Amino acid sequence: MIAWFYKYGFVLLLLNTILYSIPETNTIAPTIFYFLMGIGLILLIINPSQIKDVIFHRSFLFLLLISLVNLVYFLFFESEFNQDSLEFLMARFVQFSLISLSIYHNYDYYKKKFSSLIIKVISIIVVLGLFVDPDLLSGRYYGIIWNPNMLASLSVLAFSFVLMKNEKRTNLDVLLLILFFIVSIATGSRLALLIITVSFIYKFGLSIRNVFYAIIGFILLFLISSIDLNTSFNRFSSQDILNDRTDQFNFAVNNLEKKFWFGYGLSEYSGLPSNVDVPEEYQGLLIASHNGYLSIFLQYGIIFGFFIILIIMRKSLMLSSYFIRKEQKDNIFLFIVIITLIASMFETLLTGINEFHTILFWFSLSYLSYSKYLQDYED
């Protein structure tokens, strides 16, 4: 049982984030989350010598370093004892530990079968959504997920997993690509449109095929934007892509200036600190920062936030350079890292505990780090 949890604990943690996103299951998701955290913490305590070899493995030292930054911040720079901050500290450490243990003990599974699992699970979510709500054109589509942006995140990631497959595409793969594309566009997420565009460039480069796809895309953009819908094409063409982020960005910067050096605390990772006063003109609006980097600075302040972002960027750039030199650019996990760093300029990624895309980013970075270690060892 312990060995099984080491191998698949991360998978359970990742899939549970989807339960958080479905209104009918979001009441049981916290129970599952705390159960997984409790089991993980107990195993860390009762097997310190065995787990130490994994946590201190050179591939996962960057995760340990982030956990140490969290610990130092919590002990010396939290304005007052905060149970929510303590829970964040422990949850992040256990989450990182489960990621490290799963990769270390089950690397071949994540190399060969994990992508297939992601595609199957998200396919089920999308198909169930179409049964419950088949009308893709009446407003922003969200299926069985509580938020259209969350559905867009799932569907566009599944689209990327299918697109990046190295095996010859089957008819089912083509059908899934079309399905995930249509659902992603129907959500009205402009970020989904950006990720799809980047995924084609990443996979095929600036080839004649991509030029052809771009022409088709512009034709679709023109045709669909002339119809009164609320798809990603319509929202992209009718608005400046940054226009509804300007107020959010400025408000976040104003909040950061109030606690510039040490931020609002570990528990404030949403991009909107809970104790700030929202101006009357923003009442009723979603005024979180919608920027992962700003959210880190709001959480930690400039000093500790700089260290966190430096660790992320250094590791990401080092791994990107390595795998591109090795001509392994089509690695799906490398794409997840790159696109998350880009998407974090428009969404609050990188900081959350129970957010699918964020956890997948930390896993991808860790997987690539361990993969690099194995390849270096073979060489």
Q: What is the predicted function of each stretch?
A:
Residues 32, 37, 59-71, 80-105, ...:
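Aromatic-anchored transmembrane helix interface
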Residues 186-187, 204-240, 253-257, 266:
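A membrane-periplasm/extracellular boundary helix in multi-pass inner-membrane enzymes
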Residues 102-105, 109-137, 146-206:
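Alpha-helical transmembrane segments of multi-pass inner-membrane proteins
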Residues 1-47, 65-79, 92, 129-133, ...:
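N-terminal signal-anchor transmembrane segment
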Residues 38-41, 333-379:
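Transmembrane alpha-helices of multi-pass inner-membrane enzymes
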